Amino acid sequence: MISIYAQIASFSAIGVGIAIGVAACGGGIGMGIAANATILGMARNPSISSKLTTTMYISLAMIEAQVIYALVIVFILLYANPLLTETIAAAAK
C-alpha cells in the first residue's frame, strides 16, 4: 500500500510535468503568433518597423514572464510543496 505522502509527491510530480509542458507550449505558440504579426506588419508598412519591433519585444517579454511564473510555481510544488507539509502536520497530531 502506498502511503499518502508518496501519493501526494507522485501526483505533484505529474502535475508539475503537465504544468510546465502546457506553459511552454502556450508561450511558444504565443511568441510565434506575435512574431508572425510583427513580420506581416513590417511587410505591409516598412516605415514603422522600428516601432513594431519595440512593441514585439515588449510583448515577447510579457509572454515569457507567464512561462517564468509557471516555472516558479513548479519549483514551489517540487521543493516546498504545501500539500506535503500539511500532510506531515496532520499526521503528527
Swiss-Prot record:
<keyword id="KW-0375">Hydrogen ion transport</keyword>
<dbReference type="Pfam" id="PF00137">
    <property type="entry name" value="ATP-synt_C"/>
</dbReference>
<dbReference type="GO" id="GO:0033177">
    <property type="term" value="C:proton-transporting two-sector ATPase complex, proton-transporting domain"/>
</dbReference>
<dbReference type="GO" id="GO:0008289">
    <property type="term" value="F:lipid binding"/>
</dbReference>
<comment type="subunit">
    <text>F-type ATPases have 2 components, F(1) - the catalytic core - and F(0) - the membrane proton channel. F(1) has five subunits: alpha(3), beta(3), gamma(1), delta(1), epsilon(1). F(0) has three main subunits: a(1), b(2) and c(10-14). The alpha and beta chains form an alternating ring which encloses part of the gamma chain. F(1) is attached to F(0) by a central stalk formed by the gamma and epsilon chains, while a peripheral stalk is formed by the delta and b chains.</text>
</comment>
<keyword id="KW-0138">CF(0)</keyword>
<dbReference type="GO" id="GO:0046933">
    <property type="term" value="F:proton-transporting ATP synthase activity, rotational mechanism"/>
</dbReference>
<comment type="similarity">
    <text>Belongs to the ATPase C chain family.</text>
</comment>
<dbReference type="InterPro" id="IPR035921">
    <property type="entry name" value="F/V-ATP_Csub_sf"/>
</dbReference>
<keyword id="KW-0472">Membrane</keyword>
<keyword id="KW-0997">Cell inner membrane</keyword>
<keyword id="KW-1003">Cell membrane</keyword>
<comment type="function">
    <text>F(1)F(0) ATP synthase produces ATP from ADP in the presence of a proton or sodium gradient. F-type ATPases consist of two structural domains, F(1) containing the extramembraneous catalytic core and F(0) containing the membrane proton channel, linked together by a central stalk and a peripheral stalk. During catalysis, ATP synthesis in the catalytic domain of F(1) is coupled via a rotary mechanism of the central stalk subunits to proton translocation.</text>
</comment>
<dbReference type="InterPro" id="IPR000454">
    <property type="entry name" value="ATP_synth_F0_csu"/>
</dbReference>
<dbReference type="InterPro" id="IPR020537">
    <property type="entry name" value="ATP_synth_F0_csu_DDCD_BS"/>
</dbReference>
<dbReference type="InterPro" id="IPR002379">
    <property type="entry name" value="ATPase_proteolipid_c-like_dom"/>
</dbReference>
<feature type="transmembrane region" description="Helical">
    <location>
        <begin position="58"/>
        <end position="78"/>
    </location>
</feature>
<feature type="site" description="Reversibly protonated during proton transport">
    <location>
        <position position="64"/>
    </location>
</feature>
<dbReference type="InterPro" id="IPR038662">
    <property type="entry name" value="ATP_synth_F0_csu_sf"/>
</dbReference>
<keyword id="KW-0406">Ion transport</keyword>
<keyword id="KW-0446">Lipid-binding</keyword>
<keyword id="KW-0812">Transmembrane</keyword>
<dbReference type="InterPro" id="IPR005953">
    <property type="entry name" value="ATP_synth_csu_bac/chlpt"/>
</dbReference>
<dbReference type="GO" id="GO:0005886">
    <property type="term" value="C:plasma membrane"/>
</dbReference>
<keyword id="KW-1133">Transmembrane helix</keyword>
<keyword id="KW-0066">ATP synthesis</keyword>
<protein>
    <recommendedName>
        <fullName>ATP synthase subunit c</fullName>
    </recommendedName>
</protein>
<feature type="transmembrane region" description="Helical">
    <location>
        <begin position="13"/>
        <end position="33"/>
    </location>
</feature>
<keyword id="KW-0813">Transport</keyword>
<dbReference type="GO" id="GO:0045259">
    <property type="term" value="C:proton-transporting ATP synthase complex"/>
</dbReference>
<comment type="function">
    <text>Key component of the F(0) channel; it plays a direct role in translocation across the membrane. A homomeric c-ring of between 10-14 subunits forms the central stalk rotor element with the F(1) delta and epsilon subunits.</text>
</comment>
